[in-house]
């Protein structure tokens, strides 16, 4: 749904990295490897990395039904 603000496991703020991660790693051109993007953003913990990699942004799909 919405981007999580904090990691569910350790509580580190991860929401601030979503826009940069999305712009660099999730383009259809396949510009950069997601692991390299997360390294550049300083997201080191595995639990925090999975929060960004596994997130599906569905807020635009769900919002008409509210």
Swiss-Prot record:
Its EC number is 2.7.7.6. This is DNA-directed RNA polymerase subunit Rpo10. DNA-dependent RNA polymerase (RNAP) catalyzes the transcription of DNA into RNA using the four ribonucleoside triphosphates as substrates. It comes from Halobacterium salinarum (strain ATCC 700922 / JCM 11081 / NRC-1) (Halobacterium halobium). It is an enzyme of class 2 (transferase). The lineage of its organism: Archaea, Methanobacteriati, Methanobacteriota, Stenosarchaea group, Halobacteria. InterPro entries: RNA_pol_su_RPB10, RNA_pol_suN_Zn-BS, RPABC5/Rpb10. It is found in: Cytoplasm. PROSITE patterns: RNA_POL_N_8KD. SUPFAM superfamilies: RNA polymerase subunit RPB10 (SSF46924). It comes from the Archaea.
């Amino acid at each position: 749904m919405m981007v999580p603000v904090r990691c569910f496991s350790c509580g580190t703020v991860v929401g601030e990295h979503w826009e940069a991660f999305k712009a660099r790693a999730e383009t259809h051109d396949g510009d950069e490897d997601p692991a390299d993007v997360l390294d550049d953003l300083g997201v080191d913990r595995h639990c925090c990395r999975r929060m960004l990699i596994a997130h599906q942004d569905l807020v635009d799909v769900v919002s008409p039904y509210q």
